[in-house]
């Protein structure tokens, strides 16, 4: 489909996911990343050993979709420059030209793309509220009221992280690379907010 060929963007103008969102996702072992680590300058290594929700949200190498190309029913996203000759392949960010096909940040959106169609029409569900959102709201309310015990987090954060393939550990230290809100927050609240962003990114 045309939107896959250009990268999934807002039809009215350039779009893209932020570096801040990509950095928000933990490593699979439950530790936060250090954005200053040179390993994250490599596009492919950015996704290695990370929270499974990062891979479900952001386009990365080897994402496969139905293709309009007659010689193949499935093509992987290729790490190469955009070319007018091969418009049916999902390719890395189209950064150098103007228009609605341009990706403004370098990170394509993968979430909610229907990978089964090729004609420009497809359907994806749009949940109004998710169980995960209820768990996170409960955890945050408990923290704000001073009632967020390890038992609360084991019933709220832990199942969400484990479902995404991330090792869970009780929050104990502040991540110095986390978003600075301009005021101090607890380690619990930091991880609840991280989890909300990771779990509900692009879902309204």
Task: List the predicted regions and their residue ranges.
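Acidic/polar-rich alpha-helix caps and helix-coil junctions
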Residues: 1-19, 23-204
């Amino acid at each position: 489909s045309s939107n896959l060929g250009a990268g999934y963007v807002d039809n009215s103008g350039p779009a893209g996911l932020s570096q801040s969102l990509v950095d928000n996702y933990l490593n699979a072992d439950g530790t936060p990343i250090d954005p200053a680590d040179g390993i994250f300058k490599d596009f492919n290594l950015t996704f290695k050993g990370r929270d499974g929700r990062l891979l479900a949200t952001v386009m990365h190498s080897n994402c496969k979709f139905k293709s309009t190309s007659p010689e193949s029913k499935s093509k992987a996203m290729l790490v190469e420059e955009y070319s007018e000759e091969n418009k049916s392949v999902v390719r890395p960010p189209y950064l150098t030209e103007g228009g609605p096909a341009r990706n403004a940040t370098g990170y394509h959106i993968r979430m909610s793309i229907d990978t089964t169609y090729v004609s420009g029409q497809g359907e994806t569900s749009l949940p109004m509220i998710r169980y995960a959102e209820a768990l996170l709201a409960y955890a945050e309310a408990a923290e704000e009221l001073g009632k967020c015990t390890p038992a609360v987090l084991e019933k709220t954060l832990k199942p969400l992280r484990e479902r995404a393939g991330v090792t869970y550990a009780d929050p104990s230290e502040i991540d110095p690379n986390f978003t600075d809100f301009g005021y101090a927050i607890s380690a619990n609240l930091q991880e609840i907010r991280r989890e909300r962003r990771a779990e509900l990114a692009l879902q309204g």
